[in-house]
Amino acid sequence: MSRRSSFPVHLHGRSMLLVFVGGALGTAARALLSAAAPTVAVISVITFVINVIGAFVLGWLLESLALRGPDEGRRRDVRLFAGTGVLGGFTTYSAFAVDTDGLIVASNVGGGILYAAATIAIGAAAYLAGIALGAAIGCRRGVSA
């Protein structure tokens, strides 16, 4: 067994670099979109949109990669760079939490609960839709696990 293979993949320098660079790009994209988007009441609408889009794309990406074979080589690199890095940096749980807290602090507890529940439910639905799209495209191309 080589020294490199004895380390978990997340401790390999290449893996860390892929996640770091992807995360920087995803964070920059989110920052640019957030700066250009309006705030409604005390929440940033773009945070909701970014998180839903990110969930959808992550579902599609992971399903597409899974259908193409084991999580190794190029597929692993794509998952680490695009999934963990870009989409991890693009989506934002912290801004979602701040938006929810902002509604609650502004004495809109119901709005905070609704915003949180809607974000989670719609994000989960978007993720499942992304998986379905990845599976449908994979079936059309004749790709199977």
Curated annotation (Swiss-Prot):
Membrane topology according to the record: Multi-pass membrane protein
GO terms under biological process: cellular detoxification of fluoride
Reactions catalysed, as given in the entry: fluoride(in) = fluoride(out)
One GO term describing the cellular component: plasma membrane
Amino-acid positions noted as binding Na(+) in the UniProt annotation, renumbered to this chain: 88, 91
Keyword match Iron-sulfur: no
Gene Ontology molecular-function annotations: fluoride channel activity; metal ion binding
One Pfam entry name: CRCB
Cellular localization per UniProt: Cell membrane
Notes on how activity is controlled: Na(+) is not transported, but it plays an essential structural role and its presence is essential for fluoride channel function.
Swiss-Prot/TrEMBL keywords: Cell membrane, Ion channel, Ion transport, Membrane, Metal-binding, Sodium, Transmembrane, Transmembrane helix, Transport
Transmembrane parts of this sequence: 16-36, 42-62, 80-100, 113-133
Protein family (similarity comment): Belongs to the fluoride channel Fluc/FEX (TC 1.A.43) family.
HAMAP family: FluC
Purpose of the protein: Fluoride-specific ion channel. Important for reducing fluoride concentration in the cell, thus reducing its toxicity.
Protein name (Swiss-Prot/TrEMBL): Fluoride-specific ion channel FluC 2
Gene that encodes the chain: fluC2
